[in-house]
Curated annotation (Swiss-Prot):
Annotated source species: Burkholderia ambifaria (strain ATCC BAA-244 / DSM 16087 / CCUG 44356 / LMG 19182 / AMMD) (Burkholderia cepacia (strain AMMD))
Top-level division of the source organism's lineage: Bacteria
Stated name of the protein: Potassium-transporting ATPase KdpC subunit
PANTHER family reported for this sequence: POTASSIUM-TRANSPORTING ATPASE C CHAIN, POTASSIUM-TRANSPORTING ATPASE KDPC SUBUNIT
InterPro entries reported for this sequence: KdpC
Role according to the record: Part of the high-affinity ATP-driven potassium transport (or Kdp) system, which catalyzes the hydrolysis of ATP coupled with the electrogenic transport of potassium into the cytoplasm. This subunit acts as a catalytic chaperone that increases the ATP-binding affinity of the ATP-hydrolyzing subunit KdpB by the formation of a transient KdpB/KdpC/ATP ternary complex.
Pfam families assigned to the protein according to its UniProt record, in alphabetical order: KdpC
Underlying gene: kdpC
UniProt family annotation: Belongs to the KdpC family.
Length: 193
């Protein structure tokens, strides 16, 4: 029996040391050396204070701000510990009701309804935490935001363009706008205005 237990204990201790101590330590040092911003959560700072992460969406509901994708984490929106989609299928009547309610909320906020609503403004993402919207979703909100801030639509559209990231390496993903970064740029532009 002793001959069976000793190798098991040795393997347990060695694997615990490798996977529980050595590997995490090496990856932490590597991450801090090569990707310090990402390793620390891709935090966005304003006046030396962290105001959010570039990787996790935040709720914005005031008309003077661009709104991001809806969060599927309830009851607390954009709760990273509750990440997950709504799991409503495309034929589910509840999804259609939710989309209609979201379109009505956009209309009530004074958004121009003469053009089709971009899908990312009325549906949640798979994670429920998306920090980004499509350029079309940002363009759809330009008039409302400009009116609420007493800025020209052209000035707001220029901020959208300046905060639009292209495809990674020119081929991966789609162009996107980080809502938090755009809203911070809007605040800065209005303060300077």
């Amino acid at each position: 029996m002793k001959t069976l237990i000793r190798p098991l204990v040795v393997i347990f201790v060695v694997l615990t040391a490798v996977t529980g101590l050595a590997y995490p330590a090496v990856m932490t040092v590597f991450g801090q050396a090569v990707f310090p911003s990402q390793a620390n959560g891709s935090l966005i700072e304003k006046d030396g204070r962290a105001v959010g992460s570039a990787l996790i969406g935040q709720p914005f509901d005031a008309p003077k701000y661009f709104w991001g994708r809806l969060s599927a984490t309830s009851p607390m929106p954009y709760n990273a510990s509750g990440s997950g989609g709504s799991n409503l299928g495309p034929l589910n009547p509840s999804l259609a009701e939710q989309v209609k309610a979201r379109i009505a909320a956009l209309r009530d906020a004074g958004t121009d309804m003469s053009t089709p609503v971009p899908v990312d403004l009325v549906t949640a993402s798979a994670s429920g935490l998306d920090p980004e919207i499509t350029p079309a979703a940002a363009a759809y909100q330009v008039e409302r935001v400009a009116k609420a801030r007493n800025l020209s639509a052209d000035a707001v559209a220029q901020l959208v363009a300046a905060n639009t990231a292209g495809r990674q390496f020119g081929v991966l993903g789609e162009p996107r706008v980080n809502v938090l970064k755009l809203n911070l740029a809007l605040d800065a532009a209005q303060a300077a205005h």
